[in-house]
């Protein structure tokens, strides 16, 4: 099992509540993402950027013919399906994570690094120590 940070540029709270299993844009690392991998969802476009959810990959990466945004022709071409499992309460805010000596050098936490990035096991273990995970109910 691998760990990933997937990024959203906007809050997804309503989407998670209404549809706990959904596809996610995966233009990078598509040959490495596998069913069962853990996903840390980083929200970057809100007032308090940080890690807000944990999900699990439930379908291998696939190519979709559906085009989501005509202004971004490649967006949504490569996808994987994920199921949101936990809300992180309170969220692990970027500003707090960057104060942690063992996390401060992990580039994906410092800003936009693409839509999906691998997370080393040592980083994921530390994030799990810090996170208060609240299971999402269906």
Put a short name on every predicted segment.
Residues 1-5, 12, 18-28, 64-138:
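Contiguous surface segments at macromolecular interaction interfaces
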Residues 5-7, 40:
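Structural motif
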Residues 30-43:
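Short coil-to-beta transition motif at edge beta-strands of beta-rich domains
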Residues 35-37, 51-53, 76-80:
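A generic structural signal for short beta-strands and their flanking turns/coil linkers
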Residues 42, 60-63:
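Amphipathic alpha-helical interaction surfaces
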Residues 43-49:
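Short, charged beta-turn/beta-strand-edge "cap" motif at the junction between a beta-strand
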Residues 50-60:
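Short beta-strand-centered aromatic/proline hotspots
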């Amino acid at each position: 099992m691998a760990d990933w940070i997937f990024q959203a540029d906007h809050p997804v709270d309503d989407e998670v509540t209404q549809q706990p299993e959904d596809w996610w844009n995966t233009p990078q690392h598509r040959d490495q993402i596998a069913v069962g991998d853990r996903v840390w969802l980083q929200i970057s476009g809100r007032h308090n950027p940080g890690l807000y959810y944990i999900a699990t990959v439930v379908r291998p990466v696939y190519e979709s013919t559906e085009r989501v945004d005509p202004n971004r022709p490649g967006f949504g071409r490569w996808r994987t399906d994920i199921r949101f499992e936990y809300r992180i309460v309170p969220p692990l805010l970027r500003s707090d994570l960057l104060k942690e000596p063992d996390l401060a050098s992990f580039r994906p936490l410092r800003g936009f690094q693409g839509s999906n990035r691998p997370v080393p096991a040592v980083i994921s273990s530390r994030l799990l120590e810090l996170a208060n995970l609240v299971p999402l109910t269906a």
